[in-house]
Protein backbone atom coordinates (compact mmCIF):
# COMPACT_ATOMS: atom_id res chain seq x y z
CA UNK A 1 0.00 0.00 0.00
CA UNK A 2 2.55 2.60 1.11
CA UNK A 3 6.16 3.13 2.15
CA UNK A 4 6.94 5.98 4.51
CA UNK A 5 10.50 7.32 4.78
CA UNK A 6 10.72 8.63 8.33
CA UNK A 7 13.70 10.72 9.49
CA UNK A 8 14.87 10.18 13.05
CA UNK A 9 16.90 12.51 15.31
CA UNK A 10 20.64 12.76 14.66
CA UNK A 11 21.24 13.19 18.37
CA UNK A 12 18.73 15.25 20.32
CA UNK A 13 15.59 13.17 20.81
CA UNK A 14 13.44 16.32 20.90
CA UNK A 15 14.07 16.79 17.19
CA UNK A 16 11.60 14.16 15.96
CA UNK A 17 8.47 15.65 14.43
CA UNK A 18 4.91 15.21 15.64
CA UNK A 19 4.00 13.83 12.22
CA UNK A 20 6.77 11.24 12.38
CA UNK A 21 5.50 10.05 15.75
CA UNK A 22 1.94 9.78 14.43
CA UNK A 23 3.03 7.83 11.35
CA UNK A 24 5.09 5.38 13.40
CA UNK A 25 2.33 4.92 15.98
CA UNK A 26 -0.79 4.86 13.83
CA UNK A 27 -0.13 4.53 10.11
CA UNK A 28 2.22 1.57 9.63
CA UNK A 29 2.15 -2.17 10.18
CA UNK A 30 5.93 -2.76 10.14
CA UNK A 31 8.98 -0.60 10.79
CA UNK A 32 12.08 -1.37 8.74
CA UNK A 33 15.22 -0.43 10.65
CA UNK A 34 18.90 -0.18 9.80
CA UNK A 35 19.66 -1.57 13.27
CA UNK A 36 16.69 -2.98 15.15
CA UNK A 37 18.45 -2.57 18.51
CA UNK A 38 19.20 1.11 17.99
CA UNK A 39 15.77 1.86 16.56
CA UNK A 40 14.14 -0.30 19.22
CA UNK A 41 15.62 1.88 21.94
CA UNK A 42 14.43 4.98 20.10
CA UNK A 43 10.90 3.66 19.69
CA UNK A 44 10.70 2.66 23.35
CA UNK A 45 11.67 6.21 24.30
CA UNK A 46 8.59 7.44 22.42
CA UNK A 47 6.41 4.57 23.73
CA UNK A 48 5.96 3.10 20.26
CA UNK A 49 5.47 -0.65 19.93
CA UNK A 50 5.45 -2.04 16.40
CA UNK A 51 6.88 -5.13 14.66
CA UNK A 52 10.35 -4.44 13.29
CA UNK A 53 12.44 -5.93 10.51
CA UNK A 54 16.10 -5.37 9.67
CA UNK A 55 16.89 -3.48 6.46
CA UNK A 56 20.54 -2.53 6.07
CA UNK A 57 23.43 -2.43 3.61
CA UNK A 58 24.21 -6.13 4.10
CA UNK A 59 20.75 -7.47 3.28
CA UNK A 60 18.96 -4.82 1.20
CA UNK A 61 19.72 -6.46 -2.16
CA UNK A 62 18.27 -9.76 -0.89
CA UNK A 63 15.05 -8.46 0.63
CA UNK A 64 14.20 -5.35 -1.39
CA UNK A 65 11.93 -7.09 -3.92
CA UNK A 66 9.99 -9.10 -1.35
CA UNK A 67 9.45 -6.02 0.80
CA UNK A 68 8.22 -3.96 -2.14
CA UNK A 69 5.86 -6.77 -3.16
CA UNK A 70 4.43 -6.88 0.37
CA UNK A 71 3.83 -3.12 0.24
CA UNK A 72 2.08 -3.42 -3.13
CA UNK A 73 -0.05 -6.21 -1.64
CA UNK A 74 -1.33 -3.89 1.07
CA UNK A 75 1.15 -3.62 3.92
CA UNK A 76 2.12 -0.21 5.24
CA UNK A 77 5.79 0.13 6.15
CA UNK A 78 8.05 2.82 7.53
CA UNK A 79 11.78 2.90 6.87
CA UNK A 80 14.04 4.46 9.50
CA UNK A 81 17.81 4.56 9.88
CA UNK A 82 19.96 4.85 12.98
CA UNK A 83 19.92 8.63 12.63
CA UNK A 84 18.78 11.11 10.02
CA UNK A 85 16.89 10.68 6.77
CA UNK A 86 16.78 7.30 4.99
CA UNK A 87 18.61 7.27 1.67
CA UNK A 88 21.11 10.00 2.59
CA UNK A 89 24.35 8.02 2.98
CA UNK A 90 22.13 5.26 4.39
CA UNK A 91 19.97 2.44 2.94
CA UNK A 92 16.77 3.51 1.21
CA UNK A 93 17.35 4.17 -2.48
CA UNK A 94 16.93 0.56 -3.62
CA UNK A 95 13.65 0.10 -1.77
CA UNK A 96 12.22 3.40 -3.01
CA UNK A 97 13.16 2.54 -6.59
CA UNK A 98 11.61 -0.92 -6.37
CA UNK A 99 8.40 0.36 -4.78
CA UNK A 100 8.00 2.96 -7.52
CA UNK A 101 8.73 0.36 -10.19
CA UNK A 102 5.97 -1.87 -8.85
CA UNK A 103 3.51 1.00 -8.45
CA UNK A 104 3.54 1.38 -4.67
CA UNK A 105 3.09 4.79 -3.10
CA UNK A 106 6.13 6.35 -1.40
CA UNK A 107 6.00 9.29 0.99
CA UNK A 108 9.05 10.99 2.53
CA UNK A 109 8.63 13.06 5.67
CA UNK A 110 10.87 16.11 6.17
CA UNK A 111 13.24 15.91 9.09
CA UNK A 112 16.75 15.66 10.44
CA UNK A 113 19.73 15.43 8.09
CA UNK A 114 23.18 16.17 9.50
CA UNK A 115 24.60 18.03 6.52
CA UNK A 116 21.96 20.80 6.53
CA UNK A 117 22.71 22.34 9.96
CA UNK A 118 26.44 21.76 9.37
CA UNK A 119 26.25 23.77 6.14
CA UNK A 120 24.05 26.58 7.42
CA UNK A 121 26.14 26.93 10.58
CA UNK A 122 29.48 26.86 8.75
CA UNK A 123 29.62 30.49 7.67
CA UNK A 124 30.34 29.31 4.12
CA UNK A 125 28.09 29.92 1.13
CA UNK A 126 24.94 27.80 1.06
CA UNK A 127 23.63 29.26 -2.21
CA UNK A 128 25.26 26.47 -4.21
CA UNK A 129 26.74 23.34 -2.69
CA UNK A 130 27.66 19.75 -3.48
CA UNK A 131 26.97 16.90 -1.05
CA UNK A 132 29.49 14.10 -1.59
CA UNK A 133 28.69 11.92 1.43
CA UNK A 134 31.56 9.62 2.39
CA UNK A 135 34.73 9.61 0.30
CA UNK A 136 35.91 6.29 -1.14
CA UNK A 137 38.28 4.57 1.29
CA UNK A 138 40.76 3.43 -1.35
CA UNK A 139 39.97 3.17 -5.05
CA UNK A 140 39.13 6.54 -6.51
CA UNK A 141 39.75 8.44 -3.27
CA UNK A 142 42.55 10.68 -4.54
CA UNK A 143 40.73 11.31 -7.81
CA UNK A 144 37.65 12.45 -5.90
CA UNK A 145 39.73 14.72 -3.63
CA UNK A 146 41.34 16.29 -6.69
CA UNK A 147 37.88 16.94 -8.15
CA UNK A 148 36.67 18.49 -4.90
CA UNK A 149 39.65 20.86 -4.82
CA UNK A 150 38.46 22.41 -8.09
CA UNK A 151 34.82 22.90 -7.06
CA UNK A 152 33.51 26.45 -7.20
CA UNK A 153 30.71 25.40 -4.86
CA UNK A 154 30.83 24.57 -1.16
CA UNK A 155 31.46 20.83 -0.71
CA UNK A 156 30.01 18.74 2.12
CA UNK A 157 31.50 15.43 3.27
CA UNK A 158 30.70 12.89 5.94
CA UNK A 159 33.69 11.33 7.70
CA UNK A 160 34.49 8.99 10.56
CA UNK A 161 36.37 10.41 13.56
CA UNK A 162 39.23 8.01 12.90
CA UNK A 163 39.90 9.38 9.41
CA UNK A 164 39.09 13.04 10.02
CA UNK A 165 42.63 14.40 10.36
CA UNK A 166 43.92 12.29 7.47
CA UNK A 167 41.12 13.53 5.21
CA UNK A 168 41.73 17.16 6.17
CA UNK A 169 45.44 16.70 5.48
CA UNK A 170 44.71 15.20 2.06
CA UNK A 171 42.41 18.12 1.27
CA UNK A 172 45.09 20.59 2.36
CA UNK A 173 47.63 18.96 0.05
CA UNK A 174 45.54 19.78 -3.02
CA UNK A 175 43.49 22.78 -1.83
CA UNK A 176 46.21 24.59 0.09
CA UNK A 177 46.44 25.25 3.82
CA UNK A 178 44.48 28.51 3.56
CA UNK A 179 41.25 27.05 2.13
CA UNK A 180 38.50 27.63 4.68
CA UNK A 181 36.65 24.74 6.25
CA UNK A 182 34.13 24.04 8.97
CA UNK A 183 33.98 20.75 10.85
CA UNK A 184 30.80 19.92 12.76
CA UNK A 185 31.02 17.16 15.34
CA UNK A 186 28.25 15.50 17.36
CA UNK A 187 25.55 17.80 16.00
CA UNK A 188 22.59 18.38 18.36
CA UNK A 189 24.27 16.34 21.13
CA UNK A 190 25.63 17.48 24.50
CA UNK A 191 29.21 17.74 23.24
CA UNK A 192 28.43 19.39 19.90
CA UNK A 193 31.45 21.16 18.45
CA UNK A 194 31.80 23.42 15.42
CA UNK A 195 35.37 24.29 14.43
CA UNK A 196 35.84 26.87 11.69
CA UNK A 197 39.01 28.25 10.13
CA UNK A 198 41.62 27.44 7.51
CA UNK A 199 42.46 23.82 6.80
CA UNK A 200 45.75 24.32 8.62
CA UNK A 201 44.03 25.73 11.71
CA UNK A 202 41.40 23.01 11.85
CA UNK A 203 43.98 20.25 11.32
CA UNK A 204 46.01 21.63 14.23
CA UNK A 205 42.90 21.69 16.43
CA UNK A 206 41.91 18.08 15.85
CA UNK A 207 45.49 16.76 15.84
CA UNK A 208 45.77 17.68 19.52
CA UNK A 209 42.83 15.59 20.75
CA UNK A 210 41.11 12.26 20.39
CA UNK A 211 38.27 12.77 17.94
CA UNK A 212 34.95 11.09 18.67
CA UNK A 213 31.45 11.21 17.25
CA UNK A 214 29.77 11.86 13.92
CA UNK A 215 31.60 14.28 11.62
CA UNK A 216 30.51 16.65 8.84
CA UNK A 217 33.15 18.55 6.83
CA UNK A 218 32.09 21.70 4.97
CA UNK A 219 34.77 22.95 2.55
CA UNK A 220 34.88 26.33 0.87
CA UNK A 221 34.81 26.37 -2.93
CA UNK A 222 37.35 28.25 -5.02
CA UNK A 223 36.33 31.62 -6.38
CA UNK A 224 35.48 31.83 -10.06
CA UNK A 225 37.95 33.88 -12.07
Language-model features and meaning:
Residues 64-113:
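Glycine/small-residue-rich loop that forms an oxyanion/phosphate-binding "nest" at active or ligand-binding sites
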Residues 54-61, 134-136:
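Conserved helicase motor
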Residues 33-34, 90, 158:
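Short beta-strand scaffold positions
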Residues 24-31, 103-106, 154-155:
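Short active-site oxyanion
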Residues 70, 140-156, 174, 218:
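A charged, well-structured terminal subsegment
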Residues 94-151:
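Class I SAM-dependent methyltransferase SAM-binding "motif I" and its flanking Rossmann-like core
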Residues 1-57:
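Glycine-rich, flexible N-terminal cofactor/catalytic loop recognition
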Residues 154, 158-225:
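A contiguous loop/helix-start segment that scaffolds small-molecule binding in enzyme catalytic cores
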